[in-house]
Regions:
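Hydrophobic structural segments
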Residues: 1-314
């Protein structure tokens, strides 16, 4: 889907986060009008019906893993019943939106505050995979080009990244095989090239498809390895540098003005601020990441009193 390409669901900040299509119909259902909302409420559903929208794109999920039944006896069940009866689909973006490197919640905050050298505060692990494939020497370049064109081989600001090593490959087809090289039931040995590339896991299926299409073998030998590397762009929160150092008081006034909020809660630590970490929503889970990043200030939407007090005395 177009939404899935813009906000890959596998980039969600939590592996089991409730993102994607929560209420939907067949793939052939024509979506004519969409309504965007922060969360699904009675008013939002009523507005969707009134304006003729058959898709709601919501930030917050309506369905969570512990849902066991749909009845009018619960608020969630009543809302789901209305959506289904009125043929309204529901698509949730939640942390897939938060983690987006271009327009995620925290990235928008960082841009509004004028940060330079913006990076993810907590790069997300598990979003990268490594594809390894073995190809005849004469085809190695063709296979590489196909994989690059399909989206493999990107590492931060570099593309067409790969590693190759030559070796000796062996195989023997059974009686039903139709090998490109060699004869069934006869062991073959030939020079092959091992090709390795990193790929974002939501691109892996199309890279494999392009790789197999470019390969001459009847059965293509390849491996896909999960990586724990943090993604250089996708992550929770943002951290960046101010154009010039300023005192806590001056910076807080800027924050109030930029975000149009009448009040801020500040823990009273007065210091020169040059580097700032931000995370929309409840961000104390990433407080340690903010400290590790070297940030002088951490801005987030919700903090428990004891955590707020602890941060002032760390």
């Amino acid at each position: 889907t177009a939404l899935g390409k813009t906000l890959p669901l596998r980039s969600a900040g939590y592996e089991k986060d409730a993102v994607g299509l929560q209420v939907g119909f067949t793939k052939d259902t024509e979506l004519t009008k969409a309504l965007v909302a922060y969360e699904v409420t009675d008013d939002v559903v009523a507005e969707s019906i009134a304006v003729g929208a058959n898709l709601i794109i919501s930030y917050h999920p309506l369905i969570f893993p512990n849902l066991s039944s749909i009845t009018d006896a619960t608020r969630t069940g009543a809302l789901l019943t209305k959506l289904i009866k009125n043929d309204i689909a529901l698509y949730v973006v939640h942390t897939a939106f938060d983690a987006n490197p271009e327009f995620g919640t925290s990235r928008l905050m960082a841009d509004a505050l004028g940060f330079a050298n913006i990076k993810p505060l907590a790069p997300l692990p598990g979003l990268l995979e490594k594809i390894v494939v073995f190809a005849p020497e004469a085809e190695a370049k063709t296979v590489q080009e196909a994989m690059w064109s399909a989206g493999a081989g990107y590492i931060s600001n570099y593309d067409e990244c790969s590693f190759t090593i030559e070796g000796q490959g062996t195989f023997r087809g059974n009686a039903a095989s139709n090998p490109t090289i060699g004869t069934p039931l006869v062991r073959e040995s030939l020079r092959e090239v091992r090709i390795e590339m990193i790929v974002e896991k939501w691109k892996t299926p199309r890279v494999i498809s392009a790789m197999i299409e470019a390969h001459s073998y009847e059965e293509v030998a390849y491996d896909v390895y999960p990586l724990t590397n943090g993604h250089p762009h996708y992550g929770m929160g943002s951290v960046g540098e101010l154009s010039m150092p300023m005192t806590s008081g001056v910076f807080m006034k800027d924050v109030k003005r930029i975000f149009g909020t009448p009040t801020l809660r500040h823990n009273g630590v007065e210091k020169s601020i040059s580097k700032v970490a931000v995370l929309g929503g409840s961000g104390m889970e990433y407080y340690s990441a903010a400290r590790t990043s070297g940030a002088d200030c951490f801005i987030t939407g919700d903090i428990r009193y004891h955590d707020f007090y602890r941060a002032a005395h760390d």
